Amino acid sequence: MLKQIQKFLKLEAASGILLLVSALLAMIFANTDLNQLYFSFLQTEVAIKFGAFSIDKPLLMWVNDGFMAVFFILVGMEVKRELFEGSLSSYQKAIFPAVAALGGMIIPALVYWFINQNSPEYQQGWAIPMATDIAFALGIVALLSKQVPPALKVFLLALAIIDDLGAIIVIALFFSHEMSMQALTIASIAIVILVAMNRYKVTGLINYAIIGTILWASVLKSGVHATLAGVVIGFCIPLRGKNGEAPLHHLEHALAPWCSFAILPLFAFSNAGVSLEGMSLDKLASPLPLGVALGLIIGKPVGVFLFSYVAVLLGIAKVPEGINLKQIFAIAVLCGIGFTMSMFIAGLAFGEEDASESVLALARLGILMGTFVAAIIGYFLLKITTKPSLMKAA
């Protein structure tokens, strides 16, 4: 188990660095003479036709709806593995990070709502500061990897996975549009087939690829967000085959590098490019970016730590052996690194045709500000609280 976590941390840490580079490149492109090339490239129309069926979308939407669906397949598989075999496989293991994650979703949303309560045009962005970017957060942890207790890394992994699950539920419930019953019917049939394949332990991944593609296309046309198809596909991959094969492990192992080093950096490059032209301190201090930034910087750590502390106080959960509440607070601050999933939810909340590009830009700036501050403060707190001398004293 520990070796798997260490291997995962190395992968995610490198991915976190690449995400940062991709985001910086996007900001450079968006704020130099290359900005026209950058934005026009993202709006390039790409069409796929199959008889009467066609999907015609800008390149940016293919990244957000298509490539990110592959990432969500990985998320679905990770959640399933942790629920059945890993750090969430029993009540005792799951309750502490689950309560922490719940606080880390509720309090940031409340902070955002409080700041934007008099700005109805911004209120649909309440879910933006709820998410944690596991790649960025683990990238920071990896910088101090030698002195960070393994139990603390497991806690962060479990919390981030539950966070992802919460984000998936939020997307499903609050960011779906007008429904197409025909497309939903096709999607439902595809899901039934996938569940049956899982039930009868079909291990041929090509079968899941074919039915999964049909599911993704029908969900895309249905009005439900297409990335949710990825989660369903991930959950339907069997953990074990009839002859002891491990299809979920094999697919997870195959997809993880592609997601970490191609899909997520591409998503970051496509979505982090915010033009600062016309921006002012007044705009940066307006309710939208302020709500997002403070939701991440204040709401996240307060929510994660407060709910954890109360759970321990009431005897609902116990602090995992080998770590202390000071270290939990440091991790809680790192949970304010919301980059990837926050950008994704911001695109759903403000990226539609009825929302202006400047509103989405303000949301993204709030995410960048909040993520940067949370990363810096979280790093120093983690460094201080995991010093060997303090560990012995604790």
Swiss-Prot record:
GO cellular component, one term: plasma membrane
Tagged with keyword Plastid: no
InterPro entries reported for this sequence: Na/H_antiporter_dom_sf, NhaA
GO terms under biological process: regulation of pH
Residues spanning the membrane: 11-31, 59-79, 95-115, 125-145, 155-175, 177-197, 203-220, 254-274, 296-316, 328-348, 365-385
Cysteines engaged in disulfide bonds, as pairs: none
Pfam families for the chain: Na_H_antiport_1
Record GO terms (molecular function): sodium:proton antiporter activity
Membrane topology: Multi-pass membrane protein
Protein location: Cell inner membrane
Keyword annotations of the record: Antiport, Cell inner membrane, Cell membrane, Ion transport, Membrane, Sodium, Sodium transport, Transmembrane, Transmembrane helix, Transport
Catalytic activity, as annotated: Na(+)(in) + 2 H(+)(out) = Na(+)(out) + 2 H(+)(in)
Function, as annotated: Na(+)/H(+) antiporter that extrudes sodium in exchange for external protons.
Family per similarity comment: Belongs to the NhaA Na(+)/H(+) (TC 2.A.33) antiporter family.
Protein name as catalogued: Na(+)/H(+) antiporter NhaA
Gene that specifies this protein: nhaA
